[in-house]
Amino acid sequence: MRFKKGNRWRGSKGQIRYKTWRKMVFERNKGRVGLSKYYVCVKCNKKRKTTRVLHAHHIFSWNKFKSKRYDSKNGVVLCVKCHNGFHRKYKFEALDKPDLLVEYLNGDKAVKSYIRENK
């Protein structure tokens, strides 16, 4: 993700924190399926050796839940197709309702547990 100076520029400190958060989400994902050399989309279970075609998605929205922005447990790995599918299906409604992600992920237990603990 590249940041350009402008109305969305947050400064380099935020960029470093975001990259660190993203890396932690991906590393946590590797252990989730017991295949330490693969990253896996939690929706479709496609395995990838690199993160190029994968996104780290916030469970609790970046905009609405500022205190959870950099919590590594507040993220799941989705492939580009599944990530775009989630946002196409729920649009801005998902910003306030993290439970919609659980619905989209067919009741993912880890995500459901994190939401329950942090509401």
Regions found by a protein language model. Give the residues of each.
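Short linker/helix segments within small regulatory modules
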Residues: 60-74
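Short cysteine/histidine-rich metal-coordination sites, predominantly Zn2+-binding motifs
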Residues: 58-64, 94-103
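Short Fe-S-cluster ligation motifs
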Residues: 72-81, 108-119
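Short, cysteine/histidine-rich loop/knuckle motifs that typically chelate Zn2+
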Residues: 43-44, 81
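Short, charged surface segments at domain edges that flank catalytic/cofactor-binding sites
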Residues: 2-43, 67-69
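Residues immediately within or flanking Cys/His clusters that coordinate Zn2+
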Residues: 38-40, 53, 76
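Short Cys/His-centered divalent metal-binding micro-motifs
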Residues: 49, 75-97
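Histidine-centered catalytic micro-motifs
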Residues: 54-62, 80-86
